[in-house]
């Protein structure tokens, strides 16, 4: 209805800078976030709307990444001191139909910390594995791009299998 203003973040609004130390394993994996340059325009729209709102509904995707986006938006607004005396709700729906949206709005919940933790663990691993393995990969295989937590393990499995095939001696 007219009492709602719908704004998009267009995905994640913050990320880990690609410098060393963005994830600190010695400090309980503390992460240093920075606002994504693409997101600055959309964050301004969100913060401007939040200033004039009594209630903020975070309706990102109903998965780990969506939960993280909702958490980042809430944290960002909190850092800007825009949440005082405001009601914050997390709304999820699995389809974009009038019935599903109304049901979601009528059944709000809080941000799910376990989903946010799952995102944090995934992001920390992506950062730590990629940040530490990619430079080694670049020196050994010039022209290669990067190494991630999933592709590195998959590559290891493939090379182990290739070694088994090469060393196979038929009886």
Indicate where each model-derived feature is located.
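C-terminal or mid-to-C-terminal helical accessory/interaction module adjacent to the motor/catalytic core
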Residues: 51, 96-171
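Intrinsically disordered, low-complexity regulatory segments
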Residues: 1-120
